[in-house]
Amino acid sequence: MLHQLSLTFGSRDLLDKIVKQNSDRRFVLLAATGGAKDLQLLDISGQESIFTSHLDYQVKIEHGQPDWQGFFSFNYFDLNAESAKVFEGEVNKIAANPLPDGMTTMLVLSKLKNSSEYILLTIWDSSDAFMIWRRSNKFAPFTKYATSLNNFHAATYQLAPPKKQPEHDQA
């Protein structure tokens, strides 16, 4: 089981450099969906963070076996202590059941330096499977947290495509 996950954002060159300089770690490079150029690098080695972003999270709940492939949904919440207990209880109930069709992993993360900041990270076979779940009553337990009061925001990612190699002119 993964106990810690760290993440950072940056340009392709910067993130590739981090990966190259830390070959002893396991990373996942993600690209934002919808045509955005945003890149995110996950350190899934479980080791202390090497990033300066301070986006370091404790894995509170893990359901499924992450293979770190597919479609990634990040839902961010800032919860007070009481809401956090209720949220974790509801997620534990959900985690006691089989994952929804197409979901391979559900992770609940809380920030190491500010435990009121949560991420619900779900990994899917496809964006279609995610959208079906998102519109179903199985997502209902999360809708009450998906408000501006909880500083809610969401982002979706997929594995970043391999870096294009420069084409060499053939003379």
What role is predicted for each listed range?
Residues 1-102, 107-115, 129-135, 152-171:
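Short S/T/G/P-rich N-terminal loop/turn motif that feeds into the first structured element of a domain
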Residues 138-148:
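Mixed-charge, glycine-accented linear interaction segment located at domain edges/termini
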Residues 120:
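Cys/His-rich zinc-coordinating modules
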